[in-house]
Curated annotation (Swiss-Prot):
Gene designation: groES
Any one GO MF annotation of this record: metal ion binding
Cellular component aspect of the GO annotation: cytoplasm
Major localisation: cytoplasm
Family: Belongs to the GroES chaperonin family.
CDD domains: cpn10
One Pfam family, short name: Cpn10
Alphabetic keyword roster: Chaperone, Cytoplasm
Name of this protein: Co-chaperonin GroES
Protein's organism: Histophilus somni (strain 2336) (Haemophilus somnus)
Binding partners and assembly: Heptamer of 7 subunits arranged in a ring. Interacts with the chaperonin GroEL.
Function description: Together with the chaperonin GroEL, plays an essential role in assisting protein folding. The GroEL-GroES system forms a nano-cage that allows encapsulation of the non-native substrate proteins and provides a physical environment optimized to promote and accelerate protein folding. GroES binds to the apical surface of the GroEL ring, thereby capping the opening of the GroEL channel.
Length: 96
């Protein structure tokens, strides 16, 4: 992938979600929810603080994260893959 996010932006790829219920029923349409877990593909250099210094991001390439899938999440197709561009503020947790 040949893309570099700016500042505190992070590029992530949503993980696949299980499409069967606990009872074995195949979920489709609105019943199949989108995963809020994703793999970090690229990170910006960091948040620029008021004094001009750059605060590095807490996430790194390869991390699995849980993110807030709402306003401010930008979906893009890059190299044929759908990725999301989000601010680090939209990342709720790193899965360890």
């Amino acid at each position: 992938m040949n893309i570099r996010p700016l500042h505190d932006r992070v590029i992530i790829k949503r993980e696949e979600v299980e499409t069967r219920s606990a009872g074995g029923i195949v979920l489709t349409g609105s019943a199949a929810t989108k995963s809020t877990r994703a793999k970090v593909l690229a990170v910006g250099k960091g948040r620029i603080l008021e004094n001009g210094t750059v605060q590095p991001l807490d996430v790194k390439i390869g991390d699995t994260v849980i993110f807030n899938d709402g306003y401010g999440v930008k979906a893009e197709k890059i190299d044929g893959e759908e990725v999301l561009i989000i601010s680090e503020n939209d990342i709720l947790a790193i899965v360890e």
